């Protein structure tokens, strides 16, 4: 995976990490909100 612009790779990795972290975070938030009500 050789990109011309190294920033593109960095941004792609950041987005991938954000998505992987956001998935469980959203599920946890939704789960705790459901328990409180």
Curated annotation (Swiss-Prot):
Its main location: membrane. One of its GO terms (cellular component) is plasma membrane. It is a single-pass membrane protein. It is found in: Cell inner membrane. The chain crosses the membrane at residues 10-30. One of its GO terms (biological process) is photosynthesis. It comes from the Bacteria. Keywords: Cell inner membrane, Cell membrane, Membrane, Photosynthesis, Photosystem II, Transmembrane, Transmembrane helix. InterPro entries: PSII_Ycf12_core-subunit (IPR010284). The keyword Ligase does not apply. NCBIfam families: PRK13686.1. Belongs to the Psb30/Ycf12 family. A core subunit of photosystem II (PSII), probably helps stabilize the reaction center. PSII is composed of 1 copy each of membrane proteins PsbA, PsbB, PsbC, PsbD, PsbE, PsbF, PsbH, PsbI, PsbJ, PsbK, PsbL, PsbM, PsbT, PsbX, Psb30/Ycf12, peripheral proteins PsbO, CyanoQ (PsbQ), PsbU, PsbV and a large number of cofactors. It forms dimeric complexes. This is Photosystem II reaction center protein Psb30.
